[in-house]
Amino acid sequence: MSFSISNFIGDPFAISTLSFGLIAWIISIAGAGASNQDKFPHFSWWGIMYQLVIMVVITVLYLYNTIELYKFTLVGLLSIAFVYSTNSTNHLIYKTGDSGMLCCAAGCILLSMLNLIWILYFGGHPESPTNQFIDSFSLKTHSHNHGHLPSADNKAADGDIDDEVEYKRYSSSQGNTQFQDNNLRQSQLTTNNKSVNTPYMSSSQLNGLENFSSSDVHQSRDLTSNKRQTVYNDTNSVNDTGNVFRYKAKALYSYDANPEDINEISFAKDELLEVDDIDGKWWQAKRSNGQVGICPSNYVKLMD
């Protein structure tokens, strides 16, 4: 929000309206000065000076590129100025015997027209047809004309960029996950005692797991470490590793294990499971038939 003359001269609407307003104000002040002060309405002097202050304020806001931040304030101030200028016109227009008053009335009429234009512009939405038409003549692209509010085209462009970044992030995540799964299965085929340093995460398409972050991956446990001995080469076989499962859980939903993941187990809704190691998104679980594997934590609920 630094001072720059280019903020003002780059906007034809600002230059044209303020130039028009300055000419109308000069006509008004000249007519007021040439009028018979005994008959001239004294309150009109206040209205004329108030109009000058408004124009100075608008000029400063354009120079500092902060016009958008005060548009609602300007609408209120301009509404007052519109009342002043129209009221002065009503008192001056019928004083046909005084040319000075008629000149001042002409200036007040012009100021009333200007105030009405400003009210419609500053009070209008940036996406309205009138505002977009006026802003299209600006030499600067979205500099001060509602520059703080993105247009519909900008929103669409931003959305496309976000989608592209999200797609790249998703593709990268999928590639990393596939690489980790391949390494994990390679180690499982060679030895059951070899620890895998890369944390194992899978089935990220499940409901409730879309928003996990990289910190969650680093904090998740190694499901293939020596202390658990939970490597399963056949999901259809019944296994019992002898581990102690300290908790009971109830399945909230039915879940079908990923056929490409040998560690996952399937279960039905309301099925009772024995679970352990419940500090991550995937829990070690045991079914009633003795099958042991991992289950997504958001599909089950711990029982008291």
From Swiss-Prot:
It is found in: Cell membrane. CDD domains: SH3_Sho1p. GO terms for cellular component: plasma membrane. GO terms for biological process: regulation of actin filament polymerization. Residues 1-12, 64-65, 123-304 are cytoplasmic. SUPFAM superfamilies: SH3-domain. The chain crosses the membrane at residues 13-33, 43-63, 66-86, 102-122. Residues 244-304 form the SH3 domain. PROSITE patterns: SH3 (PS50002). InterPro entries: SH3-like_dom_sf (IPR036028), SH3_domain (IPR001452), Sho1_SH3 (IPR035522). Belongs to the SHO1 family. Forms homooligomers. This is High osmolarity signaling protein SHO1. It comes from Debaryomyces hansenii (strain ATCC 36239 / CBS 767 / BCRC 21394 / JCM 1990 / NBRC 0083 / IGC 2968).
